[in-house]
């Protein structure tokens, strides 16, 4: 299990745990130090897997808030790039899969996912291949026909009312990564994308500083799920995660079988 040292009070929001994102793998499996005689490839230890909220172009998997780790090219415990990070799941093109993530600070909003199986992944590749939201397994968030890629974040009162808002000092609470709200959603992979080595990109788009277009049309469970009054986000959003709304990126290494396999 990952160490909890240094996590209290961090400005952090969430992470993908199913399938495990690279930053969460580094938290669970990484080491701070290993003998130079040990040939095992361990990821570089991550103490804040829920702090990956920007990226440097041409990156696409997230940059830690202190700028020390860029998960587009994860590093091993010796600081060398990990060329083939271990696969975390085998999925099937065109089929639904369950996505699990936790929010350690609840900023409303929604999540989106994309898949890329190119040898040289790019943000454009993820954008071309979005997963489609099918079902919220825990809280019953609705499918949005106008924005089928969105999985809306349930109000924190429906899950963990003790989760922080990310602004008050007590927001992190206790536990390995602080109080967290668990989410499990079904998303369907696009039918025409498969490969032995692919990336699932998870994006959390917060809704506390501005609202993405269309939020006012989602009356679930009432308009209390959103932050009405904060104004509409200016489009297009910045490519690197700067400015509003605050966003978080994670990537998970997976294999995607062809449709019908």
Predicted features by range, described:
Residues 13-260:
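Structured recognition/catalytic domains enriched at protein termini
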Residues 2-18:
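N-terminal signal peptide
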Residues 1-2, 38:
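Helix-centric, low-specificity signal for extended rod-like, repetitive segments
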């Amino acid at each position: 299990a990952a160490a909890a040292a240094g996590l209290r009070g961090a400005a952090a929001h969430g992470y993908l745990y199913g399938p495990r994102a690279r930053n969460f793998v580094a938290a669970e499996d990484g080491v701070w130090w290993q003998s130079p005689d040990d040939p095992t490839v361990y990821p570089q230890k991550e103490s804040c897997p829920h702090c990956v909220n920007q990226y440097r172009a041409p990156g696409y998997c997230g940059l830690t808030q202190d700028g020390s780790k860029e998960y587009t090219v994860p590093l091993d415990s010796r600081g060398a790039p990990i060329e083939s990070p271990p696969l975390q799941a085998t999925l099937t093109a065109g089929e639904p899969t369950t996505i699990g993530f936790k929010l350690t600070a609840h900023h409303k909003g929604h999540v989106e996912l994309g898949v890329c199986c190119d040898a040289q992944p790019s943000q454009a590749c993820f954008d071309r291949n979005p997963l489609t939201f099918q079902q919220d397994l825990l809280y019953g968030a609705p499918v949005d026909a106008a924005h089928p890629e969105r999985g809306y974040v349930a109000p924190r009162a429906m899950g963990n009312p003790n989760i922080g808002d990310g602004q008050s000092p007590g927001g992190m609470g206790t536990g390995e990564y602080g109080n967290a709200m668990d989410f499990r959603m079904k998303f369907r992979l696009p039918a025409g994308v498969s490969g032995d080595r692919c990336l699932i990109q998870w994006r959390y788009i917060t809704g506390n500083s501005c609202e993405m277009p269309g939020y006012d049309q989602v009356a679930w469970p009432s308009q209390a799920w959103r932050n009405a009054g904060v104004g509409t986000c200016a489009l297009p959003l910045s490519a690197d995660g700067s400015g509003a709304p605050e966003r978080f990126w994670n990537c998970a290494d997976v294999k995607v079988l062809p449709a019908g396999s």
